[in-house]
Amino acid sequence: VAEGTESGGHIGETTTMALVPQVVDAVKIPVIAAGGIADGRGIAAAFMLGAEAVQMGTRFVATQECNVHENYKQFVLKAKDIDTRVTGRTTGHPVRTLRNPMTKEYLEKEAAGASFEELEMLTLGGLRKAVVDGDVKTGSVMSGQIAGMVKDVPTCKELMARLIRETKETVKKNSFLVEE
């Protein structure tokens, strides 16, 4: 899996657009693209970069079958394109989440030079708080930059049908690039 920095959760520094072709060129096994993929346009783009499949986390969090707390799903649905934050850069463990009071406090403490231990105590159990308890204020609501593109909570079956349709439409729309 070649996962770009647009992803939610623990991230690296390289974007999906730059990472996927480099990984495709470096290995002889199928590459799965992840990070920043929310719809058929993103899937088609990943295929054009050489990926043979995609991994979509944030988009599938907002499905009926996903067993995260309803508050978590609703927080993703309300997100805008500028609502993710990356905490933990100074610790060497960067994490992308949706902004909330906890991320604000974390980033303030991180900027002030707080110790690793102090920062760790602030986020201890944070994912469980958000996913299980539905605490989207002090929990860690891990989400990718595509959260602002998520507008509904379909079933996985409905979402898959939509993604396949959108991917085909995107490829067909851009088929003028291929000479016959």
Predicted features, each with a name:
Residues 1-2, 56:
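Conserved beta-strand positions
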Residues 14-32, 38-180:
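Conserved active-site-proximal phosphate/metal-binding subdomains
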